[in-house]
């Protein structure tokens, strides 16, 4: 069993960003659309998981776009937000599906 721990940096942009992890479970016919849409704003981590830094305005835009793609009666999207990523540590157990060399 292998473990990977990625220290995550935090940009000091004037419009302070938050760190976002999005996890989704949508019906098969919408998986590709959701994945393609989220790749525009976040980093793909593994099947149905994206992460990255977004401002509040960017997150609102992503959520608005997602609401036009998903069926809220059948699909699920979970959004985790952290105000300060410096207190977060990412650990990967097992296969690392997207070994990023630069994590935002």
Language-model features, listed with the residues they occupy:
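Intrinsically disordered, low-complexity proline-rich regions
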Residues: 1, 6-8, 13
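Short acidic, gly/pro-rich beta-turn/loop elements at beta-sheet edges
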Residues: 32, 62, 89
